[in-house]
From Swiss-Prot:
Binds 1 copper ion per subunit. HAMAP family: CutA (MF_01160). It comes from the Bacteria. This is Divalent-cation tolerance protein CutA. Belongs to the CutA family. It is found in: Cytoplasm. SUPFAM superfamilies: GlnB-like. It comes from Escherichia coli O45:K1 (strain S88 / ExPEC).
Length: 112
C-alpha cells in the first residue's frame, strides 16, 4: 500500500507507439543511453485504429511506456520525434501523482 510520502509531482509517463519491435528497441535504447528515460516498457501486439488523411487505418504496433521526470520530458519528446519513422508519432505525457517512494527515487537517480 502506498502512503502519503509516495505523492509525486515530478515524474511522468510518456506513451509512444512504434511500427515494430526493432524500431521500439532502437528508440528505447537511444533514450535510455542518453539518460532521458529511466525505464522503457515495450508491449508488442497492440493494434491501433485511427483515421489518417480521411482513411481508416489499422496497424500492428508496439506500445512504448517510458518513465521520466518533468525536467527530462521535453528532451525526451524531442529525441523521440527526431528519431521516429512516423510523420506524426504518438507522444502523450501522463503525470504520475503517486508511486512507490523507492521506485520514484530510483527513477530520479537514473536520469542525467
Amino acid at each position: 500500500m502506498l502512503d502519503e510520502k509516495s505523492s509525486n509531482t515530478t515524474s511522468v509517463v510518456v506513451l509512444c507507439t512504434a511500427p515494430d519491435e526493432a524500431t521500439a528497441q532502437d528508440l528505447a535504447a537511444k533514450v535510455l543511453a542518453e539518460k532521458l528515460a529511466a525505464c522503457a516498457t515495450l508491449i508488442p501486439g497492440a493494434t491501433s485504429l485511427y483515421y489518417w488523411e480521411g482513411k481508416l487505418e489499422q496497424e500492428y504496433e508496439v506500445q512504448m511506456i517510458l518513465k521520466t521526470t518533468v525536467s527530462h520530458q521535453q528532451a525526451l519528446l524531442e529525441c523521440l520525434k527526431s528519431h521516429h519513422p512516423y510523420q506524426t508519432p504518438e507522444l502523450l505525457v501522463l503525470p504520475v501523482t503517486h508511486g512507490d517512494t523507492d521506485y520514484l527515487s530510483w527513477l530520479n537517480a537514473s536520469l542525467r
